[in-house]
Every structure is written in C-alpha cells, then in structure tokens.
Amino acid sequence: MSAVTPVLDGLAIRLYIQPKASRDQIVGLHGDELKVAITAPPVDGQANAHLIKFLAKQFKVAKGNVTIEKGELGRHKQLRIVNPQQIPDVVAALIE
C-alpha cells in the first residue's frame, strides 16, 4: 500500500508524525509513509488534535472529516480524509 490511496469517499493516508517540530508542514515521503511535522508535543492527545486541525486546513475540510483509523498512540498513523476540497501538491504527486 502506498502512502496515499484513493478510497470511495476520499483518501486513505499513511503518516509518519514528527511532533515538537519548529513548524507545521507536510515534509514528503518517509519510507512508504507521508511525513508530517507538527509543532504540538505528544502529550495528552495534543499532537493528534493538532494534526487533525492542520490536515483539515490543508485539505479544506471540516475537522470531523479527518479521522485517525490506526495509530492513535504512535508516530505511525493511518488517516481517512472524507471529500477533500483541495489536495496539497505534495500529496497529489503521491496518489496512485
């Protein structure tokens, strides 16, 4: 499975998260996952909440349309983004 896979209602994305980064950004490929750097620390779910907010803004969807399917407690996550209104260039290049 690649980092970004189109599914029936949107996109399934496999991520590698770098918490406590200097800025929020979609970095690019990290092995077979998409690396995303976020500024929030991995404490009490802050990083997950910040990640959902950041990705919702990048894909122009409501926060409720971004769900963590796997990896709630780790750096390796699988997310689903329902009906993205915009796809960032880094992600668009990875869609198979």
Swiss-Prot record:
Cross-referenced Pfam families: DUF167
Domain of life, per lineage: Bacteria
Gene3D superfamilies on file: YggU-like
Gene Ontology CC: cytoplasm
Residue ranges of coiled coil: none
Family according to the record: Belongs to the UPF0235 family.
PANTHER family: UPF0235 PROTEIN C15ORF40
Protein name: UPF0235 protein Spro_4033
Species this chain originates from: Serratia proteamaculans (strain 568)
